[in-house]
């Protein structure tokens, strides 16, 4: 890889800043964050201070970010669940590949619309299930597998 893949992050909460953005610190040769959006000014300031994202590339809403020309190769959508589909569809319209936090949507029609748009745009959409690899879920799995609450 000659240069890192660029990312814009919609939603700078625990997932956006601590799960996804932190990867840049571990692998700067693979990932560069170029823009972000969050209603909390302290989170935007953290993105600027910790990841070198210019103030002009930090926005108060995902909609403001998505109104810009495309600022990265990939859009990470880690906003509130109810915002996922609209932001994902808008990001695909801009030509972004997507890393999409779960849930995509509780509605099958919206999931199918997103799948269709991604196919038409020839874009990759990855839906994340990152917690399944945490120690908490591993312990829970072992307890259930061992019959701690009976047969499931």
Residue ranges and their predicted role:
Residues 53-117:
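Beta-loop-alpha module in the N-terminal Rossmann-like domain of NAD(P)-dependent dehydrogenases
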């Amino acid at each position: 890889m000659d240069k890192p893949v660029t990312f814009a992050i919609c939603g700078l909460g625990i997932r956006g800043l601590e799960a996804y953005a932190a990867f840049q610190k571990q692998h700067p040769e693979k990932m560069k964050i170029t823009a972000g959006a969050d209603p909390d000014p302290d989170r935007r300031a953290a993105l600027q201070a910790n990841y070198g994202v210019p103030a002009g590339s930090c926005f108060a809403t995902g909609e403001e970010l998505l109104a810009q020309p495309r600022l990265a190769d990939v859009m990470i959508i880690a906003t509130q669940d109810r915002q996922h589909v609209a932001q994902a569809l808008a990001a695909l319209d801009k030509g972004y590949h997507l890393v999409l936090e779960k849930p995509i949507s509780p509605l099958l029609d919206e999931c199918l619309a997103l799948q269709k748009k991604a196919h038409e745009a020839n874009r990759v959409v990855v839906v994340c299930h990152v917690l399944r690899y945490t120690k908490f879920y591993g312990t829970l799995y072992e307890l259930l597998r061992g019959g701690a609450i009976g047969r499931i």
